[in-house]
Amino acid sequence: MSMSPDEMAEALQHAFQQESQRVNEAAKRAVKKTAKETRKVVQEHFTFNNRSGKYARALTVSTEYEDSFDIRQIVNFKKNKQYLLTHLLEYGHAMKRGGRTLPFKAKAYPHMIYGQEYAEEKLPENIRKEIEKSK
């Protein structure tokens, strides 16, 4: 069977498009999976007294942007304006009686940083696994 150069180019282009689509879909699945796992990691590192549970319930995974080649998911606080507490809890803050040194500073409860580190470490690994699974 012989092919003209145009037919060969068209066949190669079609094959590359299919492979590109397969890899993109696998990467999107990996991003979604990693975002859900990251949310759990952040919640596991809540070491403060979350009396009402509003802070924990407000932590969500949301899709910031998605098209055929790209997806951006973020783990953040969407409900009840709980995002206002994140910086204060993560880094501590000055108390009413003044000062930024102990005992006049509220204790820091880092929790978001663990999620960031987890996502940075796991995302490439999850992408590789999803691509291998989709073959």
Describe the function of each predicted region.
Residues M1-K79, Y91-K135:
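Short, Lys/Arg-rich flexible segments
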